[in-house]
C-alpha cells in the first residue's frame, strides 16, 4: 500500500516536472540588450582601430591636403616639428607628433563604430525582412552590401563633424579638440561642423557596402578551410582569420573610395565655401590630374590593414566574451 502510494507520488512529481519543463517558454533575445552589445563591441573595435592606425592617418591627411608631397616628406616634417619642442625627448615628442589630433577620433570612435556596427545589424534585418521562414539565414553578397550601405546613413551624422574637427586639427595649429570645435562654430556656425557631410556619405555608403561584404565573404571562406568543431559546440574566434578578413576589408574599401576621401578632406580643411564639384576641379587642375586624387594612398593602405584587422578582432572578441559570460 505504502509502496504503491510512493510510486504514484513519484510518477506524479515526474509528470509535473515534465509538464513544467515543456510549458516553459524559450528565452527570447532582448532587443535592447542586443543593441547595447552591438554598440559596446563596435566601440571596442573602434578604439583598437584608432590606436593602431592614427599615425598612418595623420600622414595620409597631410599628403591629401598638400602639406607634404610624399609619405617620407610627411614623416620628416613631423620629426622636425618634434625637434623644435623644448620639453621632452625627441622620441616622446615624435610619438606625440604622430598622435596629433588623436582626441577627436577617440571621442567620436565609440559612437561612430557603435552606430556603424549597430546600423549593419539593422541593415541585415531590413534586407532579410521578406525572407521565407525556415529558409537559410545566410546573407547573399548583395544583401551584405545593402546592409553595409544602410549602416553608413546614421553613421554619417557622427562621422562628419568628428572628422571635420580632426582634419582641422591635423592641418593647423589649433590647440585642442574643444578649441578647434569652438573656432569652427565661431567662424561658420553649427552647420560648419557638418561641412563635407555629403562627401562623407558619398564615401562611406559604397565604402561600407564593400567593407562589410568583403569582410563576411573573406571570413567565411577562410573559416571554411579550417576543420569543423563538433556539432553543438561554439566555434572559438579564429584570430588569424578575423585579422586577415578585416585587413582585406579595409584595403578593399580604401582602394575603392580613396578619391572621394581626398575630396572630402579638401572640403573639410578649406576655410572657404566649396562644393564637391569645385573641390574636384581644383584638385584635378592643381595636383596634376587623376594622380592628384591619390596622395597618401600608401600610408592609407598601410594603415587600413592593421587598423581594420584590429577593429574586427576587437568586435569579434567582445562578442565572444559576451557569449562566454552569458551577457
From Swiss-Prot:
InterPro entries: Mitochondrial_Carrier, Mitochondrial_sb/sol_carrier, Mt_carrier_dom_sf. The chain crosses the membrane at residues 33-49, 107-123, 141-162, 196-212, 244-260, 293-313. Keywords: Membrane, Mitochondrion, Mitochondrion inner membrane, Repeat, Transmembrane, Transmembrane helix, Transport. Gene3D superfamilies: Mitochondrial carrier domain (1.50.40.10). GO terms for molecular function: carnitine:O-acyl-L-carnitine antiporter activity; O-acyl-L-carnitine transmembrane transporter activity. It is found in: Mitochondrion inner membrane. Residues 1-29 are annotated as: Disordered. It holds the Pfam family Mito_carr. It is a multi-pass membrane protein. GO terms for biological process: carnitine transmembrane transport; fatty acid metabolic process; mitochondrial transport. Residues 1-11 have a biased composition (Low complexity). One of its GO terms (cellular component) is mitochondrion. Belongs to the mitochondrial carrier (TC 2.A.29) family. Transports carnitine, acetylcarnitine, propionylcarnitine and to a much lower extent medium- and long-chain acylcarnitines. This is Mitochondrial carnitine carrier.
Amino acid at each position: 500500500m505504502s509502496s504503491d502510494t510512493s510510486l504514484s507520488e513519484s510518477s506524479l512529481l515526474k509528470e509535473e516536472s515534465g509538464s513544467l519543463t515543456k510549458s516553459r517558454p524559450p528565452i527570447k533575445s532582448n532587443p535592447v540588450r542586443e543593441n547595447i552589445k552591438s554598440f559596446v563591441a563596435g566601440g571596442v573595435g573602434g578604439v583598437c582601430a584608432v590606436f593602431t592606425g592614427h599615425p598612418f592617418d595623420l600622414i595620409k591627411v597631410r599628403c591629401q591636403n598638400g602639406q607634404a608631397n610624399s609619405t617620407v616628406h610627411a614623416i620628416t616634417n613631423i620629426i622636425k616639428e618634434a625637434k623644435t619642442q623644448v620639453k621632452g625627448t625627441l622620441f616622446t615628442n615624435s610619438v606625440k607628433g604622430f598622435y596629433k589630433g588623436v582626441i577627436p577620433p577617440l571621442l567620436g570612435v565609440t559612437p561612430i563604430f557603435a552606430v556603424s556596427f549597430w546600423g549593419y545589424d539593422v541593415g541585415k534585418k531590413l534586407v532579410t525582412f521578406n525572407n521565407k521562414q525556415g529558409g537559410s539565414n545566410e546573407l547573399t553578397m548583395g544583401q551584405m552590401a545593402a546592409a553595409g550601405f544602410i549602416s553608413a546613413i546614421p553613421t554619417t551624422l557622427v562621422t562628419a563633424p568628428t572628422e571635420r574637427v580632426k582634419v582641422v586639427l591635423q592641418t593647423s595649429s589649433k590647440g585642442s579638440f574643444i578649441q578647434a570645435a569652438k573656432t569652427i562654430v565661431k567662424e561658420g556656425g553649427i552647420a560648419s561642423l557638418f561641412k563635407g557631410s555629403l562627401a562623407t556619405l558619398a564615401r562611406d555608403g559604397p565604402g561600407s557596402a564593400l567593407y562589410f561584404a568583403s569582410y563576411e565573404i573573406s571570413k567565411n571562406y577562410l573559416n571554411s578551410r579550417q576543420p569543423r568543431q563538433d556539432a553543438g559546440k561554439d566555434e572559438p574566434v579564429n584570430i588569424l582569420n578575423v585579422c586577415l578578413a578585416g585587413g582585406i576589408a579595409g584595403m578593399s574599401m580604401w582602394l575603392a573610395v580613396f578619391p572621394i576621401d581626398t575630396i572630402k578632406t579638401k572640403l573639410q580643411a578649406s576655410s572657404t565655401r566649396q562644393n564637391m564639384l569645385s573641390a574636384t576641379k581644383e584638385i584635378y587642375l592643381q595636383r596634376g590630374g587623376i594622380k592628384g586624387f591619390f596622395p597618401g594612398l600608401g600610408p592609407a593602405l598601410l594603415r587600413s590593414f592593421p587598423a581594420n584587422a584590429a577593429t574586427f578582432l576587437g568586435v569579434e572578441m567582445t562578442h565572444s566574451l559576451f557569449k562566454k559570460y552569458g551577457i
